[in-house]
Regions:
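Acidic/histidine-enriched, beta-strand-rich ligand/metal-binding domains
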Residues: 2-21, 25-113
C-alpha cells in the first residue's frame, strides 16, 4: 500500500503512514476478480473504491468512519507482521471490514515505507 500525503502522521515499528485531507493512493501487488482500486480520504471519511466482477469493471465505493482509519491501518500492520487473523473494527461498515479482511488475509495490500 503506497500512501501519499502530508499530515498528521500515524507511526509504528514498520514506518510512518500519513493521513491527509486530500487523497490516499493504494496499490495492489496482484490482481484478482475483486480488487481495491483506490483509497481516498476526504477529511471526514475513508472512501474505498472496490471493483467487482471478472474484469474488475464494476466500481463500488464504500466509506468508513474516521474512527475506523487507525483500526484499518492496524490490520494492515498486523498482516505485514505475520498475523494470520484480523480482528474487525466495530466502527467500520461491514462491507469495508469484509473487503479489507479479504484483501489483507490474501496479502494483496503491501505497505511501502
Amino acid at each position: 500500500m503506497t500512501v501519499t500525503s502530508t499530515q498528521p502522521t500515524i507511526s509504528n515499528q514498520l514506518g510512518e503512514l500519513f493521513v491527509s485531507d486530500d487523497v490516499w493512493s493504494a496499490t495492489l501487488t496482484k490482481e484478482g476478480s475483486d480488487a481495491i482500486s483506490a483509497i481516498d480520504w476526504n477529511g471526514e471519511y475513508l472512501e474505498v473504491t472496490f471493483r467487482r466482477g471478472s474484469n474488475n469493471s464494476d466500481p463500488y465505493v464504500y466509506t468508513a468512519k474516521t474512527s475506523a482509519v487507525e483500526a484499518i491501518l492496524n490490520a494492515v500492520r498486523a498482516v505485514l507482521s505475520g498475523a494470520s487473523t484480523i480482528v474487525g473494527d466495530a466502527t467500520a461498515t461491514a462491507s469495508v471490514g469484509s473487503v479489507y479482511n479479504q484483501m489483507l488475509k490474501s496479502n494483496q495490500l503491501v505497505l511501502v515505507n
